[in-house]
Regions:
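Symmetry-related core transmembrane helices of the 12-TM Major Facilitator Superfamily/SLC fold
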Residues: 1-19, 210-226
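Flexible cytoplasmic inter-helical loops of multi-pass small-molecule transporters
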Residues: 19-44
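Extracytoplasmic gate region of multi-pass secondary transporters
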Residues: 51-95, 99-102
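Helix-to-loop junctions at the C-terminal end of transmembrane segments
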Residues: 105-116, 201-202
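Structural signature of the two symmetry-related core transmembrane helices
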Residues: 119-134
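Paired small-residue
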Residues: 131, 142-150
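Intracellular juxtamembrane helix-capping segments at the cytosolic ends
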Residues: 157-170
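A late C-terminal transmembrane helix in Major Facilitator Superfamily
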Residues: 169-206
Length: 234
C-alpha cells in the first residue's frame, strides 16, 4: 500500500510539472512589464558574514538542526538505555517526535495568521524548553514521552519561520544568498551534531540527551535574540 501511495504521489507531481512552467512564464512576463525583473546579487560568504545579524542567524539555524536531528536519531536509544523500554516499544514511541513535528507544522499554518515570525520562533523555543525539562526531571516515563512530543511540536514552527523572516531581517535583495548559506549551516548541524552526541553518550552516558538538546536550545535562543537586536526587526 505504501508503494502504491508513493507511486501515486510521483504521478501527480509529474502531471503537475507543466503548471509550474506556466506559472514561471507568467511571473517572468509580469516582471518584465513592470521593469522589476533584475537579477538579485549573489553575495560571497565573506560579504554575508559582514551583514549585521547574519552570522547569528546562521548559528541559530545550525543549533535548530542540531536539536531536531539529534532528537530524531537518538530518541529511541534514550528510551531503551535510560527509560528501560524494549526496542520495539522505543521505536514506536520515538515516532511521537515526528508526529509532534507533523501536527505542529499543520497547526503553525493557522497560528501564523495571528503571530509574526519572531513570535512563532519564540513559541517553538518555549515548547521545546518545556519538553526538555519534562525529560530532564524524574516525573516518570509518561511525562518523558510527553516531553518528546513537545520537542517535536516546538521544532515545527522554527524552521519555516527562520527562512520566512530572512527578507524582513536582511532585505529581499540579500535574502536569496543568506537563505542558501542557512541551508548549508543546517546541513552541517544535521551531519555533525548527532554523531557528536554519540561520542558524548558513549563516553559519559545517554542520560545527557535532554541536557544536550537544552544547551543547543539556549544557544539558538540567544543567537536569534541577537539577530533581533542587530536588525531592529521584532
Amino acid at each position: 500500500y505504501i508503494s502504491i501511495f508513493q507511486i501515486g504521489l510521483t504521478a501527480i507531481l509529474i502531471i503537475s510539472l507543466p503548471l509550474w512552467k506556466q506559472f514561471h512564464k507568467k511571473e517572468y512576463v509580469g516582471q518584465s512589464a513592470s521593469g522589476s525583473g533584475n537579477t538579485l546579487p549573489v553575495l560571497t560568504l565573506k560579504q554575508i558574514f559582514q551583514i549585521p545579524g547574519a552570522r547569528e542567524i546562521l548559528f541559530a539555524f545550525f543549533c535548530y538542526s542540531a536539536v531536531e536531528q539529534t532528537s530524531s536519531l537518538w530518541a529511541s536509544s534514550y528510551l531503551v538505555l535510560h527509560l528501560g523500554y524494549s526496542s520495539e516499544k522505543a521505536a514506536g514511541f520515538a515516532s511521537l517526535f515526528f508526529i509532534g513535528i507533523t501536527v505542529g507544522r499543520g497547526i503553525s499554518g493557522f497560528i501564523t495568521f495571528k503571530l509574526n515570525d519572531s513570535q512563532m520562533i519564540h513559541l517553538g523555543e518555549g515548547i521545546i524548553l518545556i519538553g526538555v525539562l519534562a525529560m530532564i526531571f524524574p516525573f516518570g516515563k509518561t511525562i518523558a514521552l510527553t516531553g518528546l512530543i513537545l520537542i517535536g511540536l516546538g521544532c515545527a514552527p522554527i524552521y519555516p519561520s527562520i527562512i520566512h523572516s530572512t527578507p524582513a531581517h536582511f532585505g529581499a535583495d540579500k535574502s536569496q544568498s543568506i537563505i542558501g548559506v542557512q541551508m548549508a549551516f543546517a546541513y552541517i548541524g544535521t551531519c555533525l551534531m548527532p554523531p557528536f552526541f554519540g561520542i558524548i553518550a558513549r563516553s559519559i552516558g545517554i542520560t545527557l540527551f535532554p541536557i544536550y538538546l537544552g544547551v543547543f536550545l539556549c544557544i539558538m535562543f540567544f543567537m536569534y535574540e541577537t539577530v533581533i537586536k542587530k536588525t531592529h526587526i521584532v
